[in-house]
Amino acid sequence: NAIVVGTGNKVEDFGIGFYTKYGDGGVDISPIADCTKTEVWEIGKELGILNKIIEAKPTDGLWDDSRNDEDQIGLNYSQLEEAMENPASKFFEKYSKIRKPNLHKMKPIPICKIKD
């Protein structure tokens, strides 16, 4: 009698698809999925989360080195959020190039409909 709670935010889940399909994307509920990364940090401050945790560079934890999300993506979260909100942003082209190959993660799973 339990559920898996997701940690994905709006930028990662619906902006650029920065998650592992059926990995950190395999959840029952996603309470912060409609929040940008900036909003998640603001919520953390409001909840009294330690600044060193809030200010730590985001990482997916998949690599045994010091690379972080921004190193892998090539844009920081502020730039990604700007591109998501404004197609005229100077970051929009790079954002779109990152997003396009990950769109399959954001679409519902296709199903085969069998007629009766």
Task: Give the predicted meaning of each segment.
Residues 2-116:
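ATP/NTP-dependent adenylation/nucleotidyl-transfer catalytic domains that generate, transfer
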